[in-house]
Amino acid sequence: MPGTAITTAFIPVRNPQAAAGWYSRMLGLTVGQASDFSAVLSAAGTASVTLMGPDSGIKAQPGLAWATCNFLVDDLEETRARLAENGAAVGAIAGAPDVCLFFTAQDPDGNTLLLTDR
């Protein structure tokens, strides 16, 4: 039986190229490709994020009220501060220190993001 891996999470956006720049600046993701159709970003590991624009035919509209994945960051407080300083709506850090700390934020398209410390 072959192993299973999660390869990408899809997030609907209005402009994949602009959104890719924001995700790169705010979360340190590497832009692999970006077009009017979509943008693929990656970080450490094998998973990626695919930002899907209207030209892709995706049926979901930007502004998801729930996170399609979580983003593991090295410094939760620093990431939260950077997002807030750059105008993103951010929630309070919550969770249990011995299990997982997290906060939510919104990207410029209003999609909910979940950022975690593990």
Residues covered by each model-derived region:
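Vicinal oxygen chelate
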Residues: 1-2, 8, 85-118
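Conserved active-site tyrosine of GNAT-family acetyltransferases
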Residues: 19-24, 83, 110
